[in-house]
Amino acid sequence: MKYSDRGDVFMDKISTGIKGFDDIMGGLYPGDNVVWQVEDINNYKHVVDAFVRKSIKDEKNVNYIHFRKVNSIIDDLSKVNLFELDLAKGFEDFTMSVHNIIKTQSENAVYVFDSLTYIQRGWYSDLMTANFFKVTCPYLYKIGAAAYFSIKRNSYTYDTIAKIRETTQILMDIYNVDGSIYIHPLKVENRYTPILFFPHKIEEDKITTITSSGEASKLFSHFDWRNKRLGYWRINFNKAKAALTQDESTQERIKQNLIDILVGKDSKINEMCKQYFTLADMVQIASREIGTGFIGGKSIGMLMATAIVSKSEETKEYFKDILEPHDSFYVGTDVFYSYIVENGLWDLRMKQKTDEGYFKYAKELQDGLQNGKFSEMIEEQFMHLLEYYGQCPIIVRSSSLLEDNFGNAFAGKYDSVFCINQGTPSQRLKAFEDAIRTVYASTMNEDALNYRKNRGLDKRDEQMAILVQRVSGDYYGEYYFPHIAGVANSSNLYVWNKKIDMDAGMLRLVFGLGTRAVDRVNNDYVRIVALDDPTRLPAMTKKDPQRFSQHYVDVLNLNKNELETIIVNEAVKSNLKTQSSLFGSKDKETEERFKRVGIDTSNIPFVLNFERLLRSTKFTEAMRKILKVVSSKYNYPVDIEYTANFDKQGNFRINIVQCRPLQTRGLGKTVELPKLEDKNSCLFSSTGNFMGGNVRLAIDYIVFISSDDYVKLPEVEKYNIARQVGIINKELKGKNAMLMGPGRWGSSNPELGVPVKFTELCNMSVMCEIAYSNQDLMPELSYGSHFFQDLVETGIFYVALFDNKEDVVFNENKLRKKENIVKQIIKDANINDEVIKVYDTKGLQIYSDITQQIVTCS
């Protein structure tokens, strides 16, 4: 940074404490950052002692930023402000702490920092050392505070040194040759003398300039000029590779070091990594990382689940030919921070991290993240990655530090982007970089911000890594997709039949890309599979299998270079390279009817019922084994995203795409159900179709959406209803409220239900979806989707009420007789009280019993 860049120029000079050097250089200007390159830390101590003594004498406010775990660089701290910081807290926390210290000190302040090499060693990253300096140096310069830093010579890459040189005002080499101290200025900004850039010998308070060629040659011949400098991460990686042939104890020590670097020391999964990953595994993971830093929760979960299944005694033989190998890459968290720093977004990020700026600056930061540039060094690594995959489709997925961790699933909060990977190399690079930008920008979307805020994570250091995966599947004409995909849960909390074994687990199963399994899709249904009896159908599916089946398939269109949704018949018409009967068959009733009247049967709908897959293959057996072994090793229920592909003989390979702990509350103690005198004495009662364990919950308020009035609204007004529900949700925070409405809550299609975001119902104790079959409004049993993951994680009890079922009672008139108090609760907002009703229901309670599979509200 140049002095001319600063609006004001401080004229008072600051002494280095070495008079001869002050004379040559003209002293230090306020705002000068001085970086000393040293061989020995004692050489740095020599110039620090002189600087501190003189600054104290000149009544400067001397501040020492101490993060070295051993002795301080300053001996006498009696007149120095000591600030001890912990590097283990990470880049963001550490850097913010330094900036807060600087902010609180007087204008007459000077600073001494421990060697930046300790940052490099603590974070295993040249990149983050440079990032820290690039955001701290300009801040000190801006307020006019001089500061001393040091780095160990030949310990950084040339790229790192270049970034430090570019940022600092003064860069000095300091040498100790035969007991004499020499200073050699390499960069001194905004001043010049004919002898300034010669080496200078320090003799107490005096300076002798070395101008003789003979003396200079003799001096510099002592130094090691390396043509190639490896970063600290690369040095450690090379040590790890070398350790592969060494003794077991050395391998274990090096392996633990790599786990700490890539996973994190405090991660709960750290011990599991130690158990299931060998040093060779960790070296393989490290070799596929772009940049440095952590690889994030999603990457770790995928790797861990795969390792458990392939290495556990009870499953390794069974799955040796079933588990599809992965060849993923990881963009480390340091790249995320570098992207922020290099695009000038650090100050904005710091504003956004404050309470008052959390939402205020989010959109501006989101725009900045979406439109930044990557460094040439990182772009070169991106190109190597794309060359590796060729034109095979890949997916760029978020893998933040907190994501998919114990306690925080972040289900669907951050983006994932498919790269169909067609076009010229430059086009593919642009699409790939845009995908990463989109993931980075998604850290500032409203859902993610609210999620972190609601869980007390808004102050946590949320670093974003990227998981790059080859899309599982194959080419079928112009389309690319896996045969099947979905979500698997080891614990089936949503049961619709007393006979279902909850511990057997469940699947959400779709044909094609798994995007339809994790989202609440429009005009469509996925297959729900209870793994204790895979052919058992949920009630509504059993009633009309064709209607309540999957009608659309998500695919990658190679010609259009985009994600596309097509009808099932379009997807199955090409050669699937396996037997299409595994997944479904033509609608037989329609086919017979067409034949009777002589109509062409070629366009009869293909119904995805998966009957043969579930009855005649070992797929569900394999999935049950995966869920059992992974959940047992996690000692926790798990949620797994998977794909599977079949060959001509019907043999399959399963790909574990993602694994995370499934956030659940316990089933709770058995609840004594009230005895109902008759079916009209309750508000509702149902057998099955609820989720949330055994409960007895007080319901003080019911927010009810009138189906008859809702369906009459134009589309735009239906979206307004969703926003108004969000207003009521905020007002009822901390109160026992139940949300009741037609069809699917959270559908993006307002014709199927109220299109709320999860944050617009997150304060409810209970969510109830009501079927009105005469209006084509039906609940969707989407347990396993991101939406339902949010329900489970937040502890919201769920119930679906199906009309025209003998074991379901819903006395809607009991509500309609009550006064609508919505205008009393929300006085300032414009609420449509014809559609939205709020009832005071104090005294009402919900009871549920898992064993009997009964839920009652009375």
Regions found by a protein language model. Give the residues of each.
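Conserved inter-motif catalytic segment of the P-loop NTP-binding fold
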Residues: 58-121
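Glycine-rich P-loop/Walker A and Walker A-like loops and their local beta1-loop-alpha1 context
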Residues: 13-67
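C-terminal regions of RecA-like/P-loop NTPase motor modules
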Residues: 2-10, 191-227
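A conserved helix-loop-beta module that forms one wall/lid of the active-site cleft
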Residues: 283-344, 350, 356-359, 363-372, ...
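Substrate-engagement module of ASCE P-loop NTPases
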Residues: 122-123, 128-154
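Conserved mixed alpha/beta core segments that line enzyme active sites in large multi-domain catalysts
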Residues: 154, 270-272, 276-317, 373-771, ...
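Short, structured coil segments at secondary-structure junctions
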Residues: 78, 143, 166-168
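Phosphate-binding/switch region of NTP-binding enzymes
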Residues: 152-207
